[in-house]
Amino acid sequence: MATLFIADLHLCVEEPAITAGFLRFLAGEARKADALYILGDLFEAWIGDDDPNPLHRQMAAAIKAVSDSGVPCYFIHGNRDFLLGKRFARESGMTLLPEEKVLELYGRRVLIMHGDTLCTDDIGYQAFRAKVHKPWLQTLFLALPLFVRKRIAARMRANSKEANSSKSLAIMDVNQNAVVSAMEKHQVQWLIHGHTHRPAVHELIANQQPAFRVVLGAWHTEGSMVKVTADDVELIHFPF
C-alpha cells in the first residue's frame, strides 16, 4: 500500500482536460491508497463554500466517493483556495489540516505543507499573505455578495499575474534557510510540498543529517504525485 500526495491542480472550468484527468486519478490510483493528501491549490480560485459553481459540486462528489471507499482524504490550503471551508470539506469527506503537518509514514517522519510560506524572499507576497489570512478580513470578504467577491477575486488574480511577471524566478522559489528552519523545528528529514511548480527531489542537510525535500509538480500537461511506501518515496508524473 501507499500514501499519495498531490497539489496544484488549479481546477477551473476553462481546463476540462485537467478536471477529466483528476477524475480518472480519483477513480483509479487514489482508490488503492492508504490515504490521499491534497496539499493546496486544488482549485484555481475559491471565493467561498457557497459558490454554486457546478465544478465544485462535481469535485466534492468525486472526492467523497474516494473517502467513502475507505481512503481517508486530507487537505491543506493553498494560496489560491485558502478560503475553502468546513462546508466543502464535509461535502467532500475531506479532513482540513493546519498549514504545517507532521506525518508518521512507514517509519519516516514527514512534514507536509503547501509551500508558499517557504518563499520568504518574496517579501511582497508574504505581506499580502499575512493580510488576507487575517480572520476578520476573511469574515468580511465572505459576507459580501457573491458577485462582488467574484469581481474582487478576478482583480486580485490579475494583479498577482502582473506582479509575478516582473519577479525573478529565484525570488518566487523557496528560501533554503526557511526550508532547513521548518525541518529542524519539526525534527524531520523529509519535506513534501507544492506551490512552486518545480517538481524535483532535493537533498540537503537538516538536523545535522541528510534530508530530502520533495516538490510536487503542477497539473498542467500531465499529472504529478508523490507516492510514499515502506520502501520508497517517489515523485511520479503520469498522463491525464
UniProtKB/Swiss-Prot annotation:
Needed cofactors: Mn(2+)
Top-level taxon of origin: Bacteria
Recorded metabolic or biological pathway in which this protein acts: Glycolipid biosynthesis; lipid IV(A) biosynthesis; lipid IV(A) from (3R)-3-hydroxytetradecanoyl-[acyl-carrier-protein] and UDP-N-acetyl-alpha-D-glucosamine: step 4/6
Gene Ontology CC terms: cytoplasm; extrinsic component of plasma membrane
GO MF, one annotated term: UDP-2,3-diacylglucosamine hydrolase activity
Keyword Hydrolase: yes
Protein residues bound to Mn(2+) 2: D41, N79, H114, H195
UniProt keywords, alphabetically: Cell inner membrane, Cell membrane, Hydrolase, Lipid A biosynthesis, Lipid biosynthesis, Lipid metabolism, Manganese, Membrane, Metal-binding
HAMAP family documented for this protein: LpxH (MF_00575)
Protein name per Swiss-Prot or TrEMBL: UDP-2,3-diacylglucosamine hydrolase
